[in-house]
């Protein structure tokens, strides 16, 4: 007989999932100013994405993603959170 409880997996603990963090308003403003763009010009991530949910991102937030790279050490990318 199968148990009705769901298995919960934390995707952030997987070795291939990079570090995700929601930027503060000040940090987001600074990054957008440095890049000379509007938030909507960043690549998007849906608020329903498992990692976005895990870090508590809401539509309008900007997520900083830090990936490890064998060639350049670390690569930082940003995503704009949209509804959905």
From Swiss-Prot:
Assembly, per entry: Part of the RNA polymerase complex.
Compartmental location: Cytoplasm
Enzymatic reactions: RNA(n) + a ribonucleoside 5'-triphosphate = RNA(n+1) + diphosphate
GO MF annotation terms: DNA binding; DNA-directed RNA polymerase activity
Function noted in UniProt: DNA-dependent RNA polymerase (RNAP) catalyzes the transcription of DNA into RNA using the four ribonucleoside triphosphates as substrates.
UniProt gene name: rpo5
Pfam families: RNA_pol_Rpb5_C (PF01191)
Matching HAMAP family: RNApol_Rpo5_RPB5
Transmembrane segments: none
EC id: 2.7.7.6
Family recorded in the similarity comment: Belongs to the archaeal Rpo5/eukaryotic RPB5 RNA polymerase subunit family.
Protein name listed in UniProt: DNA-directed RNA polymerase subunit Rpo5
Gene Ontology CC: cytoplasm; DNA-directed RNA polymerase complex
Main location: cytoplasm
Keywords: Cytoplasm, DNA-directed RNA polymerase, Nucleotidyltransferase, Transcription, Transferase
Alphabetized InterPro entries for the sequence: Arch_Rpo5/euc_Rpb5, RNA_pol_subH/Rpb5_C, RNA_pol_subH/Rpb5_CS, RPB5-like_sf
Top EC class of this enzyme: transferase
Gene Ontology annotations of biological process type: transcription by RNA polymerase II; transcription elongation by RNA polymerase I; tRNA transcription by RNA polymerase III
């Amino acid at each position: 007989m199968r148990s009705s409880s769901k298995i919960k997996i934390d995707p952030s603990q997987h070795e291939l999932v990079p570090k995700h963090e929601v930027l503060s308003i000040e940090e987001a403003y600074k990054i957008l100013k440095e890049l000379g763009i509007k938030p909507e010009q960043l690549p998007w991530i849906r608020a329903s994405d498992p990692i976005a949910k895990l870090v508590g991102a809401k539509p309008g937030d900007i997520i900083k993603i830090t990936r490890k790279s064998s060639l350049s050490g670390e690569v930082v990318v940003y995503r704009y959170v949209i509804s959905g």
